[in-house]
């Protein structure tokens, strides 16, 4: 199955089955068990003020490897493999944004972290929004939102302005079709095609393969379940109520329309907004394509 360009927002995860196992990283790993019995793996490195990195849908904590090293020179960096992702336990339950937010709450509580900066890439931003909605911002100091639409699935009754502001790039039928693709025998091919749609033309084959292999760690049927929930979440009522210092990062050539990120910026009082141009790696994975600029931006913001 070949997806149309607008259907390739995130890497499409493969179906279950036999696949080559991606190589393990030498990043320092730890684990904890959630209240519903799921073992989550996380990377922790450095000391200082804490920053927690939350990856995208069907991706993994190792994708922040270019950030973990530099940031850990000044900060206590924690990058979590969310449930059923990466090295964390694969389970068929709790695959919804609200449970991922609960997992985050339990991790911060277990580690007794306060004044935490949260950085979320794509779905990771949705987890941050849900965390704030459910648990408030008492433990938090700052947030960084990287390339996530306020609402991914469009309503046929919307005006053009509503469509632009929401950043919706899928119809309801397209969501159903992608879920089916995730469970098909062609899912890994769909994954590889999807990756091509979310990186710039400057991305090397090795870089794309690394992203694919990270994606392949999540079974396709589980990815489909989480995707259905994630892509139907509407955060437009929550975003204007955020009262934390916020940095929004977008890519000019990203599948997530940059104008929707500008809408988020307008809604959050005092927020900062940065856009990577295409020549700067300004697609969905700008933190992988141009880690030097991304890291400088984050470190300046964190102070």
Give residue spans per PLM region.
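Conserved HGGG/HGGXW glycine-rich cap/lid loop of the alpha/beta-hydrolase fold
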Residues: 38-93
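Conserved loop-alpha-helix segment in the C-terminal half of the alpha/beta-hydrolase fold
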Residues: 69, 241-283
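Conserved acidic catalytic loop of the alpha/beta-hydrolase fold
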Residues: 98-116
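Gly/Ala-rich beta-loop-alpha elbow adjacent to hydrolase catalytic centers
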Residues: 120, 124, 128
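Flexible "cap/lid" loop of the alpha/beta hydrolase fold
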Residues: 129-134, 139-183
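Conserved alpha/beta-hydrolase catalytic His-Asp/Glu region
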Residues: 154-163, 177-240
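Catalytic histidine-centered segment of alpha/beta-hydrolase-like enzymes
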Residues: 279-291, 295
